[in-house]
From Swiss-Prot:
UniProt-annotated binding residues for S-adenosyl-L-methionine: T131, G152, D174, N217
Catalysis performed (reactions): L-lysyl-[protein] + 3 S-adenosyl-L-methionine = N(6),N(6),N(6)-trimethyl-L-lysyl-[protein] + 3 S-adenosyl-L-homocysteine + 3 H(+)
NCBIfam families: PRK00517.2-2
Annotated protein name in UniProt: Ribosomal protein L11 methyltransferase
One Pfam family hit: PrmA
Biological process (GO), any one: methylation
Taxonomic lineage from the root: Bacteria, Pseudomonadati, Bacteroidota, Bacteroidia, Bacteroidales
Family to which the UniProt record says this protein belongs: Belongs to the methyltransferase superfamily. PrmA family.
Location of this chain's protein in the cell: Cytoplasm
Annotated source species: Phocaeicola vulgatus (strain ATCC 8482 / DSM 1447 / JCM 5826 / CCUG 4940 / NBRC 14291 / NCTC 11154)
Annotated GO MF terms: protein-lysine N-methyltransferase activity
Amino acid sequence: MKYLEVTFTTHPCNETVNDVVSALAGEIGFESFVECEGGIQAYIQQTLFDEEALKEMVANFPLPDTRIEYTIKEAEDKNWNEEWEKNFFQPIVIGDRCCIHSTFHKDTPKTEYEILINPQMAFGTGHHETTSSIISELLEADLKGKSVLDMGCGTSILAILASMRGANPVTAIDIDDWCVNNSKDNIALNHIHNITVELGDANLLKGRKAFDVIIANINRNILLADLPHYAACMHPGSEIFMSGFYIQDIPFIREKAESLGMEFVHHREKNNWAAVKFIMK
């Protein structure tokens, strides 16, 4: 899976400007951000990159007296296992109940749920606020014996946790073949046998039997586009957990979900990132 690295140089360079850059870039497909000298670096899959959308974003930047410049290059291919070991990548503990770590970690904290992953890329490892927020939701949800769908599964951390918490069966779907292959590796690493991994998008859901629980940690635009597909495979009482967007995006998600017959339950916030829960009426 190839990524592009776009370096935004912001004038002035401050937290507010960088937060707005990240929010707007996230809406056009960028999925990871790193602060750098003079601005912020953003990463996007090459196949999803739309430079016209990027130019429009910069041209219509909403903050007054602000100038944005950018450069584009291919993100460096690295052996992420080696890089993370070298940089002392630490296990992630969420809610004192779930520890996510890799095979090279020793003496990890003992928690109720332990998820092993092989970090073969920079993204999808459980560090992001959206992933940890959905994990917190799953730790509180009643999943025993329930059918679960993980859309945009990435490394399948969420699908794996759902299975560990008693969900059965579990379906994990991603549009990227690398994610599908890495998901299968991680599922095997955790000795899980009831997760089916599929390559594709929300169109795969047509004609499916309804799921009891849906997880979708993607981004605002894809969620808004795909919510009708999700609604079509939910029954009264089905729950859906969504993340991948900012607090200010909740009204857009809520309006769309409620128009499809869903009832808003609650949201949680972490560093301005949001996770929401709805139930189908």
